[in-house]
Amino acid sequence: MVFYFSGTGNSQLAAKQIAAELSDEMVSINHCLKKGEKKTFRSERPLVFVAPIYAWRIPKVVEQWIRATRFEGNPNAYFVLTRGGGTQGNAAAYAAKLCAETGFIYRGLASAQMPENYIALSSAPSESECASIIARAKPVFSKLASQISQGKPFPEMPVSLGGRFISGPFNPLYYHLYIKDKGFTVSDDCVSCGKCAKRCPLNNIGMAEGRPVWKGNCTHCMACICGCPTEAIEYKSISKGKRRYDIMEE
């Protein structure tokens, strides 16, 4: 069973390809979070968790969801992370720790580069660059699916001292300093479609007088700002004039 969390579609694309090649079921963590349902999942096949890298680990919301969810059947767990560039740091160690604490058998963590979507800090590539990055990522996902199918663990990656730092003490500091929704604003280009509120996996966006209002529980998934059809949402002055990136399928 393949579970995925995705803001703008990178991890959704990865999960969709892996699930197709494994002929396995795909479950949206976004939808589970949105509905707030406590569910039990049973799978006789390995569990695959697909998500973006947030501050050099799996996203906190994904870890919290895994801890709060009941899984039955096959205890083997693989982690596939998408990243906009850079490194996965020491994310594998924290995924292994999560497995040890929740009763899973850790089978490894692997990451693949996908187009940058974090426009609250960086810039999204051009359309042609995005297409090239995705084309390079697809064989990586195929290889990972093959390893899962054969029951092989993902190979361990070497971790530098810097990687241990950014995934370790810097991770909670990054969340504390930067993962906030106070910087989001909306312009008069807003057409009150409500897409941002519908897509927010944490139900953090409400509509007041036809405009989005953020409620203070943001994970910076970029679903709202990148998915806005009129590009009416900005993050401080950082995102102004920047290309949006969104390949999410509803």
Residue ranges and their predicted role:
Residues L22-E25, K180-K182, G210:
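Generic structural motif recognizing short loop/turn segments at the entrances and edges of beta-strands
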Residues S160-S192, K198:
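A mid-sequence, solvent-exposed acidic-amphipathic segment
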Residues V2, S6-A14, A20-L33, E37-A51, ...:
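FMN-binding flavodoxin-like domain, especially the glycine-rich phosphate-binding loop
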Residues S122-P125, S149, Y175-V186, H220:
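Repeat-unit-sized solenoid/scaffold elements
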Residues Y245-E249:
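Active-site-proximal loop/hinge segments that shape catalytic or ion-binding/gating pockets
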Residues T185-V186, V191, K195-T219, A223-K240:
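Iron-sulfur cluster-binding cysteine motifs and their immediate structural context
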Residues T40-F41, R70, L177, K198, ...:
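Generic structural signal for beta-strand residues in well-ordered domains
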